[in-house]
Curated annotation (Swiss-Prot):
The lineage of its organism: Eukaryota, Fungi, Fungi incertae sedis, Microsporidia, Unikaryonidae. This is Eukaryotic translation initiation factor 2 subunit gamma. It comes from the Eukaryota. Residues 20-27 are annotated as: G1. Residues 48-52 are annotated as: G2.
Length: 439
């Protein structure tokens, strides 16, 4: 427990996604808890919607004195100390959770981005605006995504209750309960008004007491899902002063340390005729950060930034999203064709849930990878999918299947990888020698 607390002081240990229909308050709820706005890009600010995956860390504290539940729970930024003074009663606030929030876009054309975010989630907040009928289209699709990724812990946040009467809020609460019964998802419904901070302590209470800390394996081989990548150098920086590329994501298993030799798969993908050549990026970790906190080692859970010696041009503008990072020579295989056991959603609010056909083009989400695919041999329960872009993945991994309907990719089903055809990665001679020594 002491070790877990020491880790929690420095980095988040739990990933919670915010999902739901567009403009239902996902980014606002994250800001109410963390104090950080996840809307940062120019296009997002202009339109006041999330376009890329947003992220923010927050520490949740519990007052050990006179404050009673749920008001004994308070949240602050991730750089806050592990003990604070309670301004309500003068008691001591003790750290009980350190959470990374993954803020997903709600617009229908950004469904693939939302699905990428589910790859690293341990639990979700499903936002439903109280001033609109339930369900809205993306509420339904996002709930499908929760089922696909087998996320068991769901908190339904009935937001914007300040915009409706008590009777309207209760009526919509009944709509939400009926909606949840149409799926395999269940969870408590928490009314909030995030814009003015109403009932945020109750939400924190549920995060602490309803969502358990996931069991992590820090002794396994490290595997990090990449959801962001950056070039942090300002224009005009001299070559001798440039920093290497920065990779953002979440460690699923294992540990990473400053100085580790790392590999990123599938890396640089080149098409030669009818075959792919994959050259993984090989680099070294020069820094680890959890927001503004410097780390010497990173544990599974939470979002971290990894500074590398890579050419930053390969990392800029999220070029590495969908790749997988780990220690050199110890990552899953790279597949260009997969056999999937799948099922389509029997109930859907959109058209086009007909059977998949040989030769049809579909979109697959594998981990944080989004890739087009052409269907090969297929029957009602399994099929072969030729990937437009190779993916680093594992047998048994869950995938999401989307079909283009009215010029938009819409989620229609899910599956599990049962087999596949691999690509042998190509390395420079000196890297091959290093791998043999590591083996």
């Amino acid at each position: 427990m002491n070790d877990a607390l020491e880790i929690m002081k420095k980095q988040a240990t739990l990933n919670i996604g915010t999902i739901g229909h567009v403009a239902h308050g996902k980014s606002t709820i994250v800001k109410a808890i963390s104090g950080i706005s996840t809307i940062k890009f120019k296009a997002e600010l202009e339109r006041n919607i999330t376009i890329k995956l947003g992220y923010a860390n927050a520490k949740i504290y519990k007052c050990d004195s006179k404050c009673v539940r749920p008001n004994c729970y308070q949240s602050f930024g991730s750089s806050s100390p592990d003990r604070l003074s309670c301004k309500k009663c003068g008691g001591t606030l003790k750290l009980v959770r350190h959470v990374s929030f993954v803020d997903c876009p709600g617009h229908d054309v950004l469904m693939a981005t939302m699905l990428n975010g589910t790859a690293i989630m341990d639990a979700v907040l499903l936002l439903i605006a109280a001033n609109e009928p339930c369900p809205q289209p993306q509420t339904t699709e996002h709930l499908f995504a929760v089922e696909i990724m087998d996320l068991k812990k769901v908190l339904v946040v009935q937001n914007k209750i300040d915009l409706v009467s008590r009777e309207q809020a209760l009526e919509q609460h009944d709509q939400i309960q009926k909606f949840l019964k149409t799926s395999n998802v269940s969870g408590p419904v928490i009314p909030t008004a995030a814009q003015i901070g109403v009932n945020i302590p109750a939400l924190l209470d549920f995060i602490v007491n309803y969502i358990p800390e996931p069991v992590r394996d820090s002794t396994a081989r490290p595997k990090m899902i990449v959801i962001r990548s950056f070039d942090v150098n300002r224009p005009g920086t001299r070559v001798c002063e440039m920093s290497g590329g920065v990779i953002g994501g979440s460690l699923v298993t294992g540990m990473l340390r400053v100085g580790d030799k790392i590999e990123i798969r599938p890396g640089l993908v080149i098409r030669k005729g009818n075959r792919f050549v994959c050259r993984p990026f090989v680099s070294e970790i020069v820094s680890l950060k959890a927001e503004s906190i410097d780390l010497s080692e990173a544990y599974p859970g939470g979002l971290i930034g990894v500074g590398t010696t890579m050419d930053p041009s390969f990392c800029k503008a999220d070029k590495l999203v969908g790749q997988v990072m780990g220690k050199l020579g110890f990552l899953p295989s790279i597949f260009h064709k997969i056999t999937v056991e799948y099922s389509l959603f029997p109930k859907t609010t959109i058209q086009g849930s007909s059977k998949l056909k040989e030769g049809e083009h579909v979109l697959l989400n594998i981990g944080s990878t989004t890739t087009g695919s052409v269907i090969g041999r297929i029957n009602e329960t399994s099929g072969e999918f030729d990937l437009v872009k190779p993916a680093c993945c594992e047998i048994g991994e869950r995938i999401a299947i989307s079909r283009k309907i009215n010029n938009h990719w819409r989620l229609i089903g899910h599956g599990e990888i049962k087999d596949g055809t691999c690509i042998e990665p190509e390395y420079d001679a000196e890297i091959d020698d290093a791998q043999r020594k590591a083996d």
